[in-house]
């Protein structure tokens, strides 16, 4: 399983087109899984994916964690959909559908596939489990992608884990192959208003410890910090601090073979 990080910033990332983005700024959240799967479809995703040499016409499925503006952009979704070789599947939580604001004309290019918590999906040569995230009004979703014996957890926007999510991950199976963890607040000061729905500098080390002690992550399992907040650029202390906590700090354009 090969993944490419197309955007690694939290809300606060510049919500502007790729062509206008300063070189040192992180992009809004998006991830490509080789084989035609995209996770989150933020404003810069399509143009940056093309810059990275990704076959954007080969994208068949987009999984949307939630429709906040740093994860979803209708224009970017339609850029992927209208360029795709086949009609695109968009998987999102059932209450997100009205927020997408897709017209009948848009739906000629997109199959909207509403999902529920704990649902299992098979598409694009992989199995996907939908998990409840701890974010916003409780309608954000996380995913476990399984392909060719490899398993990837994607959990951006959420603090810690919801009980159902934790019990699913901690079911005694072998460790996951890799995990992508929310790292919205890796520095002080902590915004306690948002602390209930984003990981912060106090929680982040405990997440690594809990994953390893429970066996969800093995000793050498990559635990990747993504959705990185203040500062909203690749410079600064956040990557160093996250690495010291046991994370691989993600950056835009990072490619990882799991």
At which residue positions do the language-model features occur?
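Conserved beta-strand hairpin/beta-sheet module of binuclear metal-dependent hydrolase folds
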Residues: 1-52, 139-156
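Active-site metal-binding motif and surrounding structural segment of the metallo-beta-lactamase
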Residues: 43-91, 175-179
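Cap/insert and terminal regions of metallo-dependent hydrolase folds
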Residues: 161-257
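Active-site metal-binding loops of divalent metal-dependent hydrolases
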Residues: 8-9, 36, 43, 67, ...
């Amino acid at each position: 399983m090969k993944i490419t990080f197309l955007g690694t910033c939290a809300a606060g990332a510049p919500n502007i087109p790729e062509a206008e983005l300063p070189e040192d700024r992180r992009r809004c959240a998006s991830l490509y899984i080789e084989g035609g799967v995209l996770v989150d479809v933020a404003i810069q995703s399509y143009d940056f994916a093309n810059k990275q040499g990704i076959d954007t016409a080969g994208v068949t499925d987009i999984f949307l964690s939630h429709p906040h503006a740093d994860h979803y952009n209708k224009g970017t979704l339609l850029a992927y959909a209208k360029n795709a070789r086949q009609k695109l599947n968009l998987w999102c939580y059932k209450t997100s559908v009205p927020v997408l604001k897709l017209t009948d004309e848009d739906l000629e290019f997109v199959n909207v596939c509403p999902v529920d918590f704990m649902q299992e999906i098979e598409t694009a040569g992989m199995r996907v489990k939908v998990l409840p995230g701890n974010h916003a009004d409780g309608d954000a979703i996380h995913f476990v992608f399984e392909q060719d014996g490899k398993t990837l957890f994607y959990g951006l926007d959420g603090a810690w884990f919801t009980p159902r999510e934790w019990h699913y991950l901690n079911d005694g199976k072998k460790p996951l192959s890799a995990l992508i963890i929310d790292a919205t607040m890796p520095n002080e000061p902590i915004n306690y208003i948002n602390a209930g729905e984003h990981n912060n500098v106090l929680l982040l080390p405990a997440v690594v410890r809990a994953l390893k002690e429970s066996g969800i992550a093995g000793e050498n399992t990559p635990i990747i910090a993504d959705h990185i907040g203040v500062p909203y650029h690749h410079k600064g202390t956040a990557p160093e601090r996250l690495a010291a906590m046991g994370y691989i700090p993600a950056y835009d354009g990072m490619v990882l073979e799991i």
